[in-house]
Amino acid sequence: MQPTDVKNPDYFHKVVDCQWACPAHTPVPEYIRLIAAGRYSDAYMVNWESNVFPGILGRTCDRPCEPACRRSRVEEENNPKPEPVAICRLKRVAADYKDDIRGRLPKKGKSNGKKIACVGAGPASLTVARDLAPLGYQVTIFDQDPRAGGMIWSQIPRFRLPLEVIDEEVGYILDIGVEFKGGVKIDSMKKLMTEGYDALFIGSGAPRGRDLDLPGRKEGAKNIHIGIDWLSSVSFGHTSKIGKRVIVLGGGNTAMDCCRTSKRLGGEDVKVIVRSGFEEMKASPWEKEDAQHEGIPILNYLVPKKFVVESGKLTGMVFEKVKAVHENGRRDLVPTGEPDQHFDCDDVLVAVGQENAFPWIERDAGIAFDKSNMPVVDKVTMQSSAPNVFFGGDAAFGPKNIIWAVAHGHDAAVSIDKLLNGEDIAERPAPGVSLMSQKMGIHEWSYDNEIHADMRYKVPWRDIKITLKNVKAEVELGFDVATAWKEAQRCLNCDVQTVFTDRLCIECDACVDICPMDCITFTGNADEKELRNHLNAPAKNLTQDLYVSGPLKTGRVMVKDEDVCLHCGLCAERCPTGAWDMQKFLLEMTNAGPGCRSHRQKKAA
């Protein structure tokens, strides 16, 4: 193998598994260290710079960082149920215990004369506004709802996300000088294009829930509701009750929100019915656990066949029992041949997916759409076929989640800023990277001189007798300070990297002897496949890179499997020549502003 290019910003970034997995690339170990030190406001600001909504995401994020967490991998053989660090809930700690941080937020920049319109007031549009307003852009956000936040406030129940948390963090953005026009529905793209805006950002979400065209649908329409519309109606205060017997159709997070909300609005016999298996459900594992904790059964492998309507009233549903069959590399659901199953109900909530809807974008407005009736959008720049029109969030590529919408907003803001400064938006400067040597001995970066197989600490819940009676009573109470400190110490500080200097190595193999995970090997060079199988501990995880040195004095190379390294620093402490060094990796993502335009400025200079 060729020596590893550690100057490539992606190399050490990828080693910080949580940050690499986060669409907004939040520096997770950095803010966890700040929480452990009691510096909650600093931890909040580290989050705010990258993910914009720490308090909101600390309660609702889909947590792509946690399945990637190294803690789970290194404990697989020592712990019956290895669990990642509670990254998401520690984010909430920063939000819960911060001081007043308004003085640390950016102010509206001096006007540069450029106007930006954002359609939809969800997380993608708000991120665009957050990034551009301090640069002097006049940003106006339009939304048909009277309150900013989009699906954050209209579709996520208050028992998961209190309104005051939304208002606080949305308010931080609007207070930068962003104009919000609530209750204004944009019904013509061509008209908007004539209103003097230099760039348009479309963050209108995926506002249409999928329906089920089954026998009995029209006859029982009064008691058959589209899930996201029903949740919005609850948020608006238009809906405050539901029948005692409720069936929720669907296996995603919206279905989990629907069933739990139903339980609080009068539903006594509430069940979720899904066509797939339990493990294949799209809902996050913790969302399913939360529903089951509240006594809501999830019934799998049942395909809806018809709504049962008697004397004009919905009375139940009929389902066909299916099973999963794997043939020729495909997975299909086939009938089992068992009798159909009937379930009584008073109401049905249909939460089987969401779709985009762009009836307001005329097809002769210069914006290309694909065969699926989705806008053609560049996945890097977020630009449509109309040069000054950008898309993000669910409006760009279909339903995803809040943290992806934030990432899209950052990318679109960079593109808008470059476009309106006369630059090629496809030229994206690489992130800034710095590596700083850390003190040895009593570590600056680790919490303990030993790595313990510590179990994940559980977030306390409010008494279920209270929460099931009040749709606004927040269920999770968040970590207290003491528990947050203990959970923070489970972090392995993967951003403190093991950096190897070939010329200093005397090949004493002391680092090999002391490594607790056997992830360092000195061996003859070979291709990657052969090296992976001939290390002290075979490197079987192909998603994790090998760190390979240049040729050493004996002709051998140092090979380190990044997969299970604990970042404990023992190799660096033991090395007599300083060939190993522990260096803290800091990644600065390229955001809108002078940094994203630096390439052109340097060439001009």
Model-based region annotation:
Residues 1-9, 78-115, 138, 152-153, ...:
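Flanking helices and flexible, charged tails adjoining ferredoxin-like Fe-S electron-transfer domains
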Residues 20, 24-107, 172-174, 182, ...:
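Glycine/serine-rich phosphate-binding loop and adjoining beta1-alpha1 elements at the start
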Residues 25-37, 44-47, 77-84, 88, ...:
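Beta1-alpha1 glycine-rich phosphate/pyrophosphate-binding loop at the start
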Residues 93-110, 168-183, 188, 209-265, ...:
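Glycine-rich dinucleotide-binding loop and its adjacent helix/turn
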Residues 221-243, 327-399:
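FAD-site-proximal beta/loop scaffold in flavoenzymes
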Residues 258, 395-422:
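A conserved FAD-binding loop/helix module that cradles the flavin
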